[in-house]
């Protein structure tokens, strides 16, 4: 099954997440199909917290990709920010 989920990056105690489309059988930070955005929970000042390609997310969801709970919330936040 294809899922849209977070893949952790960054350094120890400084998380940074790529939002990726991946096969659910692959490791969390392993092989992915496409990177559709990023999430930086520790962004400060003018740094961007969330960037998401909503068109590609819609494409994958329409083709049957499932989203994790956290990614679903981030998608909702991104839609609210663009509206």
From Swiss-Prot:
Per the record's keyword annotation, is Ribosomal protein included, yes or no?
Answer: yes
**Which BP terms in the Gene Ontology apply to this protein?**
translation
**Its GO CC terms?**
cytoplasm; small ribosomal subunit
- Please tell me whether the keyword Ribosomal protein is annotated for this protein: yes
Q: Name one Pfam family in it.
A: Ribosomal_S16
PROSITE patterns, per this entry? RIBOSOMAL_S16
> What keywords does the record list, in alphabetical order?
Ribonucleoprotein, Ribosomal protein
Per UniProt, what is one GO molecular function of this protein?
A: structural constituent of ribosome
| Database matches in PANTHER family | 30S RIBOSOMAL PROTEIN S16, SMALL RIBOSOMAL SUBUNIT PROTEIN BS16M
* Family the entry assigns: Belongs to the bacterial ribosomal protein bS16 family.
Task: Spell out the protein name for this chain.
Answer: Small ribosomal subunit protein bS16
Species per Swiss-Prot/TrEMBL record: Shewanella sp. (strain W3-18-1)
């Amino acid at each position: 099954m294809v899922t849209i989920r977070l893949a952790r990056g960054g350094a120890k105690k400084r998380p940074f997440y790529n939002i990726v489309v991946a096969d659910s059988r692959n490791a969390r930070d392993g092989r992915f199909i496409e990177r559709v955005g990023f999430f930086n929970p520790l962004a400060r000042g003018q740094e961007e917290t969330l960037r998401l390609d909503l068109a590609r997310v819609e494409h994958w969801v329409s083709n049957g990709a499932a989203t994790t709970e956290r990614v679903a919330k981030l998608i909702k936040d991104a839609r609210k920010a663009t509206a």
